Structure formats: structure tokens, C-alpha cells
Amino acid sequence: MPAVWPPRTVIRKSSGLRTLESALYRAGLGPVAGVDEVGRGACAGPLVVAACILGPNRLESLSALDDSKKLNESERERLFPLIRRYAVAFHVVFIPSVEVDRRGVHVANIEGMRRAVAGLAVRPGYVLSDGFRVPGLPMPSLPVVGGDAAAACIAAASVLAKVSRDRLMVAMDQEHPGYGFADHKGYSTRAHSAALNDLGPSTQHRFSFINVRRLVVDGEPGQGGELECGKLAVDVPVDMPVDRVLREGQLSR
């Protein structure tokens, strides 16, 4: 029986992004998958969750990996194809805003993490998640506080999720003009709030968020028309048209 790991751990950044993964591989618990999400705090657009396995060896091509929120856009875009090329396996899940409303952000996030791990072409022996415990996984897992800045596989998942969501929000800006999705990516900013006040919510907004819900008149959304019901978690490629996001496809390897 492998050693029982603590229920939650903090890894110092100075110890290196591969320290925890290397320890797990040495203990015979690999392959090690990292899982992370982006879009929890946005009031529009999907919640995006990615899982990624990098393998036991350090790759110089991915030496710039860091928490995707600390990398600038050009650095994330440069790393995105490299991660897809060198990863042993990865899988990205998009959870539509209507399901975030229906299930709640936390429940949708945990379900998305399970789906992302289940979608990996290589079954991991261990899963590292960024901060959140993920119940229901068929393999041992460990939530790591600040994991996207402490474990390379989580950092890679963070970049995959962030770039995938950002690209989708840019495309969504074309289908729902006026909100500025390409700029703020669905997060609450002064410009986004002003657009919401002028246009009302679209079908891509999260009606469970108070700043959106207060603008709904008689339960009807604004510019976007009727709310569309989607599946709980739909896996889509980053270049798929937004009108197909809720229905089909996948981004994985």
C-alpha cells in the first residue's frame, strides 16, 4: 500500500515546480496529473477546467511554466502549443454558464475537474488539484494550496484552461457585440457593468450572480433571447464556433 498523503498541503514555490511531482513518481504513484480551472469569478462565459500530465522528466521547452495568472498573454500563448505538444495527455472541459447557474460555481467546478481527469487518454496514478479537494476520483489525489505556482502539471493545466477560455471569450465578443468580452473576458469591470446596464444580460451571462440577476426583468434575459439549456460539462476545441460550444467536440490528447 502506498503511503497515505496528508489531506491538503502547501508547497513552497522556492522548492521548485517539479518537487512534488518528482516525489510522487519516485514513490511509484505516477503518472501525475494536474487539474486547474479558470472563470470561477466571471459573471459571463463558461467555467473552464483542464487536466494535464507532463511526465517525470523536466522539459526545457516548458521551463517558463508558472501560474497562468502571473504570465502575460503572449507568454501563455507561446506556452499553449508547447504544452499540447509535449504533454503526455491533456483534456479541457467547458462548463456553460447555464450549468454554473444551475449547479452553483463550486459544484460545477468539482464536476468539471472530475470530467477533465476522466477525459485524459492516459489514466493518472495520482492527481494534484489547485486548492480544491476533488471527491469521487478513482485514484488518490491531493489539493495543493497555490498549486498552479507549485506544481508544473497544475501550472500547465492552468495555462491550457486560461488560453482556451480567453480565446473563446474573444470569439464570443463577435457573437455578442457591445459587452467587451474580448477585453474583460466576462469578469466584472466598470466597462462590463456599464454594458450590462445599457444592453441587459445576454444568454452567456450567469444569472446567479447578483450584478446580472438584478438587471433581469420578469425573469427574461436581455439581448441574447431565451436561456439555452446545456449539458453539465461539454468538452470543446478552442477554435469551435461559440454556437456549438454547448453541444459537441473536445480538446484533448
UniProtKB/Swiss-Prot annotation:
Gene Ontology BP annotations: DNA replication, removal of RNA primer; mismatch repair
Coiled coil: none
Binding site for a divalent metal cation: D36, E37, D130
Cofactor note: Manganese or magnesium. Binds 1 divalent metal ion per monomer in the absence of substrate. May bind a second metal ion after substrate binding.
Any one of the GO CC terms: cytoplasm
Cofactor(s) of this protein: Mn(2+); Mg(2+)
Keyword field: Cytoplasm, Endonuclease, Hydrolase, Manganese, Metal-binding, Nuclease
Sequence ranges assigned to domain RNase H type-2 in this UniProt record: 30-221
Keyword Nucleotidyltransferase tagged: no
SUPFAM superfamilies: Ribonuclease H-like
Principal location: cytoplasm
EC annotation from Swiss-Prot or TrEMBL: 3.1.26.4
Disulfide linkage: none
Molecular function, one GO term: RNA binding
Catalytic reaction annotation: Endonucleolytic cleavage to 5'-phosphomonoester
UniProt key word Zinc: no
Superkingdom field: Bacteria
Compartments in which it is found: Cytoplasm
NCBIfam families: PRK00015.1-3, PRK00015.2-2, PRK00015.2-4
Family indicated by similarity: Belongs to the RNase HII family.
Function recorded in the entry: Endonuclease that specifically degrades the RNA of RNA-DNA hybrids.
Protein name: Ribonuclease HII
Species for this entry: Mycolicibacterium gilvum (strain PYR-GCK) (Mycobacterium gilvum (strain PYR-GCK))
